[in-house]
């Protein structure tokens, strides 16, 4: 089935003049393909997709797109990718949507070749996440991001490389800016919106608005037609991706308002020092959060790049470089019920993953919404959630081969690609540094309702209950009150 939904009204945003190379053809690659076809002019005879598995090869065969059934590895990436990315004239585009592909090495290669590049995570080569010889600090996303930042500082400028631009990390950084502008307006603050490149101005506005922290607050209510059997891991997006990040240490951007740190909390000795990590797996760490549909909920403090990049971006420093303000920032993720059950089984078996991994596609799911937004809290209006409430039904109508979760990612990849084509020599950028308005303009047709909600909920609501708790009643929005212990 080719893209039956391609109608004349979808805008074509630009032309990719060189070859297109997509690394990975799992749930996100499959969903991104029709969006690339719909919104860009490109030479299909110079598009190549690489994946070690050929599960969905027929989608490529019917389009006449070349498929290479091979994993991109540390040993073969230069030899494998260089001819594909330099095939014919024009500027190529490398779209990395795979696990176990060393992002920083691929960025370096693309910049050397003058090729545009985008990914959804700073991904290491195979073996990093489960390296028993490595200490936990070196298995963090903080360490991965620092490697990317070093590359950026060592070699500024050059062909645009968009780092970590999916739904989250990625889109949520654009939501944070829109939410901040909405909040500052509703608070009646006198302000003019900072320019895209004015990081300091954005940080000062966040401080002025009195925001103590930000949850990337998500609830996935997509349900399957049939119940999950035992000994399989079901998820609405990459199972390998979820397991690897779920078994990394929990990580959070660490705000200046925090008065208490868990005993197993650890600071970093080098770099921005914008984040801390806990000596426990993120997918087995719960926090109290809030989304519009369920209201109060438990979320998982799974590590994500945006928890670090957003906290870093909105840091206010003195002239001497001393940190004067920083918001706490972390993921608070309630995945689909089947994924929660899968995690429960996995951690029950001491973290041993189930032998069968399966991504639930749009045909196996019956209904539900992926409600993904940012919760700005601790200000004079208490808390404000702003985000996408995309339903499975709407995702099915908008584009083929994806559920609601996938579409929030693929549409962010699309927006990042558009921005890169329009700004081809920006060097390495994170989503926080891009033009959030332009990116959301491109992405919003795929996001369902994008709305803001104020709430009077705090993590101290209905607490303590029947049992004594260690709470900080002077400030409801302390991490002490948010972390489930």
Swiss-Prot record:
Cofactor(s) the record lists: NAD(+)
EC number: 2.5.1.44
Highest taxon in the source lineage: Bacteria
InterPro entries per the UniProt record, alphabetical: Homospermid_syn-like_C, Sacchrp_dh-like_C, Sacchrp_dh_NADP-bd
Keyword set, alphabetical order: NAD, Transferase
NAD in keyword set: yes
A single MF term (Gene Ontology): homospermidine synthase activity
Catalytic activity annotation: 2 putrescine = sym-homospermidine + NH4(+); putrescine + spermidine = sym-homospermidine + propane-1,3-diamine
Pfam families tied to this protein: Sacchrp_dh_C, Sacchrp_dh_NADP
Known role: Involved in the NAD(+)-dependent synthesis of the polyamine homospermidine from putrescine.
Entry similarity comment: Belongs to the saccharopine dehydrogenase family.
Protein name as it appears in the record: Homospermidine synthase
């Amino acid at each position: 089935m080719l893209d039956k939904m391609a109608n004349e009204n979808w805008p074509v945003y630009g032309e990719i003049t060189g070859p297109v190379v997509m690394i990975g053809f799992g749930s996100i690659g499959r969903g991104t393909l029709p969006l690339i076809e719909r919104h860009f002019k490109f030479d299909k005879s110079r598009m190549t997709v690489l994946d070690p598995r050929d599960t969905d090869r027929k989608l490529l065969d019917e389009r006449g797109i070349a498929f290479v059934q091979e994993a991109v590895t540390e040993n073969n990436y230069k030899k494998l990718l260089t001819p594909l990315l330099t095939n014919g004239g024009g500027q190529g585009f490398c779209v990395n949507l795979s696990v176990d592909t060393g992002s920083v090495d691929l960025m370096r290669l693309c910049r050397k070749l003058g090729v545009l590049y985008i990914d959804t995570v700073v991904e290491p080569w195979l073996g990093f996440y489960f390296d028993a010889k490595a200490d936990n600090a070196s298995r963090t996303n903080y360490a991965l991001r620092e490697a990317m930042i070093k590359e950026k500082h060592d070699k500024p400028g050059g062909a645009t490389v968009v780092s970590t631009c999916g739904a989250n990390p990625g889109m949520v950084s654009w939501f944070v800016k829109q939410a901040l502008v909405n909040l500052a307006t509703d608070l009646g603050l006198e302000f003019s919106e900072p320019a895209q490149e004015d990081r300091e101005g954005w940080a000062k506005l966040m401080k002025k608005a009195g925001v103590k922290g930000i949850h990337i607050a998500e609830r996935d209510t997509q349900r399957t037609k049939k119940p999950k059997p035992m000994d399989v891991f079901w998820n609405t997006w990459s199972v390998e991706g979820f397991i690897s990040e779920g078994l990394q240490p929990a990580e959070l951007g660490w705000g200046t308002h925090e008065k208490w740190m868990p005993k197993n909390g650890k600071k970093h000795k080098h770099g921005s020092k914008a984040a801390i990590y806990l000596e426990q797996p993120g997918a087995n760490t719960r926090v109290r959060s809030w989304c519009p549909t369920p209201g109060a909920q438990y979320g998982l403090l799974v590590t994500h790049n945006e928890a670090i990049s957003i906290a870093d971006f909105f840091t206010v420093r003195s002239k001497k470089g001393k940190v004067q303000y920083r918001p706490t920032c972390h993921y608070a993720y309630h995945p689909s019920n089947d994924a929660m059950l899968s995690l429960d089984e996995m951690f029950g078996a001491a973290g041993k993953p189930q032998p069968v991994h399966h991504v639930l596609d749009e045909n196996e799911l019956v209904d539900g919404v992926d409600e993904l937004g940012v919760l700005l809290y601790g200000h004079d209006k208490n808390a404000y959630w702003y985000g996408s409430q995309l339903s499975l039904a709407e995702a099915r109508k908008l584009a083929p081969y994806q559920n609601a979760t996938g579409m929030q990612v693929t549409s962010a990849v699309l927006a990042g690609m558009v921005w890169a084509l329009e700004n081809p020599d920006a060097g390495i950028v994170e989503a926080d540094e891009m033009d959030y308005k332009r990116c959301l303009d491109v992405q919003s047709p795929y996001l369902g309702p994008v709305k803001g909600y104020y709430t009077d909920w705090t993590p101290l609501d209905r607490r303590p209950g029947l049992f004594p708790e260690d709470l900080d009643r002077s400030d409801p929005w302390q991490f002490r009150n948010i972390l489930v212990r």
